[in-house]
Amino acid sequence: MFTGIISDIGKLEFNSEDEIHITYSNNHFSNLEEGTSVAVNGCCLTLRNYENNKLVFQVSTETLSKTNINPNNNNYVNLELPATLTTFLSGHIVQGHVDNTALVDRIEQLDNDMWNFYFKGVDTKYIIQKGSITINGISLTVVDPEDDKFHVAIITETYNRTNLQYLKEGDTVNIEYDMIAKYIEKQK
């Protein structure tokens, strides 16, 4: 389980068909054990090993086909360590199970150093106005869901601490819908 509060941004490199290396700069990752879960762009991956500020993960064909963790996408990824019983939950409960990907439709910089990011290609039956959504592992609040689109308002702090700063229109992002919304929809 994760909180959607990003610890660091890493640089993704493909070492082989099923192995990725992520270079990071933050000390949060210096004392990890092999087998630890790490959210990479919101996708829960198991740490194979690490050395010299580099995390190594094995990735399945399923992960490569269902997420934006692939050689054709942006090489900057958001990283988060799993929550513990003492973790301050300042985002929302994130499982690290990517539901689908969406496209960045438009990015709008506002006058007050804030941004609106518009996304399309989502299943809005799991999205409500002011509800939680996870985009590339980031806990965010939905604005104006309609048809297969919605947008989020991004403050400077979130923009600077995440890979949102590297996104451009047409890029693919990972989406995890709110777990409670998925359970409610299943009960219908």
Describe each region flagged by the PLM:
Residues 1-188:
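Conserved loop->alpha-helix
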